[in-house]
Amino acid sequence: MNLPNKLTMMRVVLVPIFMIFAAVSHYGTADFHAAYMLIAGVIFAIASITDFLDGYLARKNHLVTDFGKFMDPLADKCLTTAAFIYMVTDYVCSPIVLAVILFREFAVAGVRMLAAETGTVIAANMWGKVKTVLQMLTIIFYYFVGALAGPTDVGFVSFATVVLCWFCGAATLLSGGIYLWQNRKLFMQAK
């Protein structure tokens, strides 16, 4: 297994660890909550960095593999979806935004399956990357700033996170629409 694929697998392993710390941050004292939110944020940030590094190293060193093409987006989806689920339970992300994110991911997966059947290669587009970066930055903002905020700042952090989540929802909807439009020929060719 090459280094980019090891980084992808590291991200897969970090997902349940992130989920544990995000879940236990709901219990205990304010200090306990802040500490576990910060740990969850650090884990998420490390996992996000591996997302950048695995793709960069794979392309730079000509180490792109079918395994990486499959596992990298799957690891990303697991990581960001888990974080948004916890943000919904913290009432800083609307379930509508989560539904938009999930719908887009299922739609894109469907398009990729159609593409695989026809032997079509679909390149990632800029809008998908913008969406991913915005989602990851929003999640990192919530976990880091939320953990470090004082009692008087909680309202601002919650409000800012809600606004950022709606921007994520809009970016997700836009990137999904563009992706589906760019690949509409696959639907026409489907039997």
Q: Positions of the model-derived regions?
A:
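Alpha-helical transmembrane bundles and membrane-interface segments of multipass inner-membrane proteins
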Residues: 1-191
